[in-house]
């Protein structure tokens, strides 16, 4: 799936050593897709990452952009054991 990274997302991915394959998996086939609570243009794609202790990767992206613009990405501790 094609997407664009914001400058913030690029920085976070490098700092936290988030593998591109994990990001691709979350965007291509999320385990859970949620709307943003206050911004209808944003979606949250959540993906359990077995290669990283089954932690849940949360990718927040602007779905109105073509290709989608990834705003931020992080491992969501609040989702541990929920997916």
Model region roles, listed by residue range:
Residues 1-83:
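Ribonuclease/tRNase effector modules and their secretory precursors
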């Amino acid at each position: 799936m094609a997407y664009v990274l914001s400058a913030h997302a690029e920085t976070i991915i490098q700092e936290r050593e988030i593998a591109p394959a994990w990001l691709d998996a979350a965007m291509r086939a999320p385990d859970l897709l949620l709307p943003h609570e206050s911004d209808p243009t944003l979606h949250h794609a959540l993906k359990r990452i077995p290669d990283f202790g089954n932690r849940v990767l949360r990718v927040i992206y602007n779905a109105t952009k073509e290709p989608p613009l990834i705003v931020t990405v992080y491992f969501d501790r609040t989702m541990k054991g929920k997916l």
